[in-house]
UniProtKB/Swiss-Prot annotation:
Keyword Phosphoprotein tagged: yes
Organism: Homo sapiens
Phosphothreonine modifications at: T458
Protein name (Swiss-Prot/TrEMBL): WD repeat, SAM and U-box domain-containing protein 1
WD repeats: 10-47, 52-91, 95-134, 137-176, 178-228, 237-276, 279-318
Gene name of the encoded protein: WDSUB1
A molecular function (GO) term: ubiquitin-protein transferase activity
Amino acid sequence: MVKLIHTLADHGDDVNCCAFSFSLLATCSLDKTIRLYSLRDFTELPHSPLKFHTYAVHCCCFSPSGHILASCSTDGTTVLWNTENGQMLAVMEQPSGSPVRVCQFSPDSTCLASGAADGTVVLWNAQSYKLYRCGSVKDGSLAACAFSPNGSFFVTGSSCGDLTVWDDKMRCLHSEKAHDLGITCCDFSSQPVSDGEQGLQFFRLASCGQDCQVKIWIVSFTHILGFELKYKSTLSGHCAPVLACAFSHDGQMLVSGSVDKSVIVYDTNTENILHTLTQHTRYVTTCAFAPNTLLLATGSMDKTVNIWQFDLETLCQARRTEHQLKQFTEDWSEEDVSTWLCAQDLKDLVGIFKMNNIDGKELLNLTKESLADDLKIESLGLRSKVLRKIEELRTKVKSLSSGIPDEFICPITRELMKDPVIASDGYSYEKEAMENWISKKKRTSPMTNLVLPSAVLTPNRTLKMAINRWLETHQK
């Protein structure tokens, strides 16, 4: 459903932020640099890294066109860069000289907001590079900032836990205590929840904080009816402070990264967990979806940025409810089964399956014996392949029926893992199951069929922690 396709390890210190444009990925770090990569092959651009800041770079963001990149730093500056050649366009100094923690472009590229450690927030004219408006929150440092998709207002989050809403004239529209121990990040979904009368639009806003929670809010604003912020729900998948959150471009997914070293991907419609990713070895500090592809970037204090790719077809299946998925599979017609066989690169079996009237229900009940004896499939390799694919289909039905994320299920036992370990093939398994697998002199990987380089099993504590957290929130 989601796979790690690339790891960037060029920074010399903690990765603080990552951001996508339509063609580039930008990352910034405690090492004072910003790096730019092409999305074609994830190679670093010739004019990267970008160097100017004298202290840690906390945040970076692209203008909507992708031609300009903004970066901000502990040195009290926000810098604009030309992404095509790396040329520095402007250096904008925070009026107070305070460390700048966050920066964000408005949707129309006319303004750039910067928030600082002393609680000041500045709106800059992104064309003239001059200060347009300045304000400040009552208490705490600025840690988060997000513009509404229509650009009529923006939200800031503070270390005191307050969400503050500002209009484009820097007038405070609303302030609300959102997270007890401080806000770390916030993001708007670019897709409206619905359109109402009188031009009223509703948007989802996600916020996360030191209280280990991700909260969803519904926001509306018109000049006639004013502003309204309504709390909707809390996502409690993490067991440590949540440092980052971001919506996918289509608004269908929400991702969060945490001090517990995990990344969680949620379905925004059902709020179910789709994936828990546990590859980072230290705090996950940032996460971002690409605007036009099914790519996700996650950055960490382990100095790396991981690039993940989603499978659209499988992802759509994962969003089905238990009844819908079961009904969908069991109600497959013979033609549906033929289509599935072709998709699995098993088109040679279409004729045999049609001749034997194999529909969805019969497909799920096929066994090793029935493939050989009843369907007369002579090739052992072909029988093994189709059986593997059917088992994958059964597993999806079973895991999604129970609501268990795929990453929590042992590939050998097909059950929820209690004591996950990482084998030398890089996959996680239930400890007892993998020990039994190896003790029977099966020195090949259950997942790849390649020879295991080593019999060493390493406890996957991060995954175990994520499973325990999931169990706590799903026990009835």
